Amino acid sequence: MSLKQQADQLLSAAVTDGTVPGVVALATNAEGTYYEGGFGERIQGDGVEMTPDTVVWLASMTKAITGAAVMQLVEQGKLELDAPASRVLPELAERQVLEGFDDAGQPVLRPAEGEITLRQLLTHTSGFVYDIWNRDFVKYLELTENPGIISCMNAALDIPLAFDPGSRWDYGIGIDWAGKMLEAASGQSLGAYFLDNLFAPLGMDSTAFRLTDEMRGRMAKVHARLGEREFELQMELEIPQEPEFEMGGGGLYSTIGDYAKFVRMILNKGVADGQQVLKSETVEMMSVNHIGDCRVPLLKSAVPESSNDAEFFPGLEKGWGLSFMILEQDAPTGRPAGSLSWAGMANSFFWIDPKNGIGGVYATQIIPFADTKSLPLAESFESLVYQNL
């Protein structure tokens, strides 16, 4: 059987048996997409088909795009990776570290040692974390009544650090701060900068922070898994459309086809349709580990309705680049060491394999993250892609 037959069979069966309400996936090489499929429904029960042009919430798949945009400004000398970030954003100076809580339940804070840098913000080593995988920060947000990051309110960024900058790796909101640095250095909003410098050159005309009416007409909604084959529609779950800040860590909507254009730009070492979007040496710099001996570990859930415990390829070494996860050992799917990847909260996933010159994009719209059915389905799809190389 061909890849198309095998992948169609795999994905359609997952919809037929109720594993996922809807799914889209594609495989691409440096020239173009050579498999794409869409199955199931955008909104469970409404009869509207999930198709490759369905608009989905990218969530943290936004991070790689923000990383690429920031690196354009590094190329131009408008931002520096290792200078104190407070030179661009004074509010990043003299941050506090949350040590825990005292007997009265109040936060215990101390001054951070060391300066936050842009490199740390892009690699999750700045000390900024998400509450979703950190119980202390769940408690801190409850105590202080700080909004969560998904609110896109500036107050959501004003949290202490979990550790001193550069001392370890923990997944967090650093890339939202990197987006703020881009805005300060470019004089544009994140969305306007992305449009001018990435989306227009790449032809990504279905990708934006703010949904157009036309995009909304093709949009899938997020479903919360209640059981093996039972879902609850989350009609209200949407990134604020009049945000205080555009969320570089997770605010974009897109299609798998649009995201594949970004994947191909990376596979082509920064070139898209004859335009040099990033220098080849910049793409190479983004594609290697920048966290030294730190490793990307299991993310232990502190908010079960948002995420399960999450780890890709348990037991394998994973680093982090600018801003992708970097696989350091060959994976059982066939993905080799040196490949780049990450994911979005509603169980969307991508990978970029420079060695074989291929990549893949997969999306469902299911929470919690690291869904017990969708993640294995994505890995099965990836395995088929490699079996058919």
PLM region descriptions:
Residues 2-58, 78-80, 94-103:
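Short, conserved catalytic-motif segment at the N-terminal edge
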Residues 3, 7, 58, 62, ...:
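Hydrophobic (often cysteine-bearing) scaffold residues that line and stabilize catalytic clefts
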Residues 6-12, 25, 31, 57-85, ...:
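Active-site SXXK
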Residues 34, 351, 357-366:
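Short, well-ordered beta-strand elements
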Residues 42-51, 369-379:
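A short, polar/charged loop-to-alpha-helix boundary motif
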Residues 87-332:
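Short, surface-exposed loop or secondary-structure junction motifs
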Residues 339, 346-355:
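Short, surface-exposed beta-strand/loop micro-motifs that present aromatic residues
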Residues 376-389:
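Surface-exposed amphipathic alpha-helical segments
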